[in-house]
């Protein structure tokens, strides 16, 4: 079956074709980054209007890539939520209208479930079960995944998402939009331990996380540097050092919490998905991850166990239509009820946890 996937939850318009027998056939994406940069952030009305302009050309581009026609489409999947209301409505309206015209089923998909399953698009796929870290601008959650549609929420950020903390910290440092990626780039030139920031909740017994306090620690450091220099500008090397210290703190917290999740579940496979999954430091740290099974006092320590870690291909870390087409195809194959026009801008992942 050939499933058309449509993603329009924020500032990327993604369209893709996934074949249940042949895999991903085509993937087209338009980012609105340049358009929103002028405003220092996403403008919802502009995002919605741009999605409307892009959906038809992107669909036709995907069909051309795959050597297919509208008549070959067996189902249409779209992001129902969460996201910006107007942006979601643009994708939902198009998906439902197209499905109606083609007399094909329409499949609503949870945006985060799309991210959760995106590593399954890679050539080397993880086996179930696994611990999933969903880490993006809007969400930071740790899930136990036992199969398609079989998810359990283990922990999440109680305030800012990790990606949101990256973007807000970048803004504090005067970096251009989108700041998170620029912060990561500058962190490569930062000196280790020139600054040391707290690792909030890293030692808590649960799997909850917090990043707002870390952002405050950066603000305090920035204000101190400016006061010492008697100027608003931050020296280039100092800025890079702050970027590195911030990034190291975030990655340390994420790694520590995922290790606790592995010990809690007994799983030895990790999947990292979402925009922050493209971060080089995070990939390096998780790629070398091991877990140490606790031993009773006085007993020999168990040897460390290597963890298998999977990331989606870089093209599928950010929002994209491929993950929506794939998730839709998986649900269609399991006989999920289809057909939905409404959108859900606020849609907790816990509501689809089985």
UniProtKB/Swiss-Prot annotation:
Its EC number is 2.3.1.234. GO terms for cellular component: cytoplasm. The keyword tRNA processing applies. GO terms for molecular function: iron ion binding; N(6)-L-threonylcarbamoyladenine synthase activity. Substrate binds at residues 134-138, 167, 180, 279. Disulfide bonds: none annotated. SUPFAM superfamilies: Actin-like ATPase domain. Its main location: cytoplasm. GO terms for biological process: tRNA threonylcarbamoyladenosine modification. Binds 1 Fe(2+) ion per subunit. Fe cation binds at residues 111, 115, 319. The keyword Metal-binding applies. It is an enzyme of class 2 (transferase). It catalyses: L-threonylcarbamoyladenylate + adenosine(37) in tRNA = N(6)-L-threonylcarbamoyladenosine(37) in tRNA + AMP + H(+). Pfam families: TsaD (PF00814). Keywords: Acyltransferase, Cytoplasm, Iron, Metal-binding, Transferase, tRNA processing. It is found in: Cytoplasm. Required for the formation of a threonylcarbamoyl group on adenosine at position 37 (t(6)A37) in tRNAs that read codons beginning with adenine. Is involved in the transfer of the threonylcarbamoyl moiety of threonylcarbamoyl-AMP (TC-AMP) to the N6 group of A37, together with TsaE and TsaB. TsaD likely plays a direct catalytic role in this reaction. This is tRNA N6-adenosine threonylcarbamoyltransferase. It comes from Neisseria meningitidis. The gene is tsaD.
């Amino acid at each position: 079956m050939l499933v058309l996937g449509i993603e329009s939850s924020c500032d990327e318009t993604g369209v893709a074709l996934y074949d249940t027998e042949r895999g991903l056939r085509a993937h087209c994406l338009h980012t609105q980054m340049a358009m929103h940069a002028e405003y220092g952030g996403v403008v919802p009305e502009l995002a919605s209007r741009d999605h409307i302009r892009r959906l038809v050309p992107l669909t036709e581009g995907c069909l051309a890539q795959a050597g297919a026609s509208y008549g070959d489409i067996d189902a249409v999947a779209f992001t129902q939520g969460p996201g910006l209301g107007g942006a979601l409505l643009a994708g939902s309206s198009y998906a439902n209208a197209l499905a109606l015209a083609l007399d094909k089923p329409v499949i609503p998909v949870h945006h985060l479930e799309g991210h959760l399953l995106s590593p399954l698009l890679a050539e080397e796929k993880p086996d179930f079960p696994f611990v999933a870290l969903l880490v993006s601008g809007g969400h930071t959650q740790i899930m136990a995944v036992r199969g398609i549609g079989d998810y359990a929420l283990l922990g999440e950020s109680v305030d800012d998402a990790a990606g949101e903390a990256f973007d807000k910290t970048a803004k504090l440092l005067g970096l251009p939009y989108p700041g998170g990626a620029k912060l990561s780039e500058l962190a490569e030139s930062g000196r280790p331990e020139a600054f040391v920031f707290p690792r909030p909740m890293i030692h808590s017994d649960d799997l909850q996380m917090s990043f707002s306090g870390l952002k405050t620690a950066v603000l305090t450091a920035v204000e101190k540097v400016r006061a010492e220099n008697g100027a608003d500008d931050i020296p280039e090397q100092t800025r890079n050092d702050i970027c590195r210290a911030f990034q190291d703190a975030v990655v340390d917290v994420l790694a520590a919490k995922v290790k606790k999740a592995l010990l809690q579940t007994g799983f030895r496979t990790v999947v990292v998905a979402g925009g922050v999954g493209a971060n080089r430091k995070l990939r390096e740290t998780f790629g070398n991850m091991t877990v140490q099974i606790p031993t009773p006092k006085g007993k020999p320590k168990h040897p460390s166990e290597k963890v298998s870690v999977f990331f989606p291909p870089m093209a599928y870390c950010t929002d994209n239509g491929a993950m929506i087409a794939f998730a839709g195809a998986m649900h269609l194959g399991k006989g999920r009820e289809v057909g939905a026009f409404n959108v859900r801008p606020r849609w907790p992942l816990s509501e689809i946890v089985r």
